[in-house]
């Protein structure tokens, strides 16, 4: 499966196998029937070259057909969309030189076929009554909804605490930006918290995929808790990227933040290093000024193109806050009505941010 990372392939495969899908129903039937199965999720020339015996079917997929075909020896080959059963009772002969950590014949074959073809392969163990999914070099054992929900709810509680702390440090940053008292430490604290929220949210979204129809409520709770976090992540970095004198593109900074090890993420000096700020001594307490992207994006009905022009024209937030309606009208695309909306919007944000901090 080209152009997809191993994590993406695994997540998409788990979505196909989630509760409520026909394939999951078929696997549950196989487990209840106390039989095993070897199922390849895709068919091409490579899979064909590894296949001997069996018979071609090319019939519509259904859970009951999968269950009946699993009673026979040999593998079942489905198409990539899991909409048709291509072959059944097939003996798969992958390259025996491919390394495998499995001991059972069915699992060894599944792992080797997954590595050689690039398609996900499912192995249902008759003796252990487990379903293992192989994607490339990855092996994943399917769990029941109750076990996944238990972990997901625990992660959701952690996310709620992280989000509350993020809102707190973000509110503090807004007030400090208005007063022009921001330090590198304040910026890094917000970026750190956004990244922590993003990571726990990614973990929960994986649970949502695995849960399928059982994860609808969890999905709604997740959407509510992470609303606005993605845009804020980019806007905060854009606000201070020039101040840090970082010479690379914005996307490179965001990728570096995402790639930080968990132990480095809790160290603000490591976050500062990724953002391009100098590290050492009292550098975290150095004063910095934002460009104004984040606060301007909180002004209602202000197009992104106008935000870009305002920042280009005035350079930083303090000059934007000091600008009169006439000054704002000098920006291309900003008439009197929009200038007044920007002026009043920034004034309200300034007032509310300071009130939230000191009251």
UniProtKB/Swiss-Prot annotation:
Domain of life: Bacteria
Name this polypeptide is given: DNA integrity scanning protein DisA
Needed co-factor(s): Mg(2+)
Family in the record: Belongs to the DisA family.
EC number: 2.7.7.85
A GO term, aspect molecular function: diadenylate cyclase activity
GO term, biological process aspect, one: DNA repair
Reactions mediated catalytically: 2 ATP = 3',3'-c-di-AMP + 2 diphosphate
NCBIfam families: PRK13482.1
Organism: Kineococcus radiotolerans (strain ATCC BAA-149 / DSM 14245 / SRS30216)
């Amino acid at each position: 499966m080209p152009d997809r990372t191993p994590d993406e392939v695994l997540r998409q495969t788990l979505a196909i196998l989630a509760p409520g899908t026909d394939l999951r129903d078929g696997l549950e039937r196989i487990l209840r029937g106390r039989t095993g199965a070897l199922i390849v999720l895709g068919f091409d020339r490579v899979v064909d070259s590894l296949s001997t015996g069996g018979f071609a079917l090319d019939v519509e997929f259904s859970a009951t057909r999968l269950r009946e075909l699993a009673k026979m020896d040999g593998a079942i080959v489905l198409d990539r969309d899991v909409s048709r059963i291509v072959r059944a009772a097939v003996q798969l002969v992958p390259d025996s030189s491919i390394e495998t950590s499995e001991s059972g014949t069915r699992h060894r074959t599944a792992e080797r076929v997954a590595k050689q073809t690039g398609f996900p392969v499912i192995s249902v163990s008759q003796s252990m009554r487990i379903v293992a999914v192989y994607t490339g070099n990855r092996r994943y054992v399917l769990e029941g909804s109750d076990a996944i929900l238990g972990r997901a709810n625990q992660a959701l509680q952690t996310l709620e605490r992280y989000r509350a702390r993020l809102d707190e440090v973000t509110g503090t940053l807004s007030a400090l930006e208005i007063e022009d008292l921001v330090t590198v430490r304040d910026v890094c604290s917000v970026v750190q918290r956004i990244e922590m929220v993003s990571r726990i949210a990614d973990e929960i979204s994986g649970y949502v995929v695995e849960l399928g129809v059982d994860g609808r409520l969890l999905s709604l709770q997740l959407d509510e808790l992470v609303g606005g976090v993605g845009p804020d992540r980019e806007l905060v970095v854009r606000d201070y990227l020039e101040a840090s004198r970082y010479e690379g593109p914005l996307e490179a900074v965001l990728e570096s933040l995402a790639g930080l090890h968990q132990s480095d993420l809790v160290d603000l000096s490591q976050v500062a290093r990724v953002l391009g700020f100098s590290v050492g001594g009292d550098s975290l307490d150095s004063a910095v000024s934002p460009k104004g992207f984040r606060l301007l994006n909180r002004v209602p009905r202000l197009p992104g193109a106008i935000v870009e022009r305002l920042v280009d024209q005035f350079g930083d937030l303090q000059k934007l806050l000091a600008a009169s309606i006439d000054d704002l009208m000098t920006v291309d695309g900003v008439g009197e009505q929009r200038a007044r909306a920007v002026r009043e919007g920034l004034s309200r944000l300034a007032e509310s941010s300071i009130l939230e901090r000191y009251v």
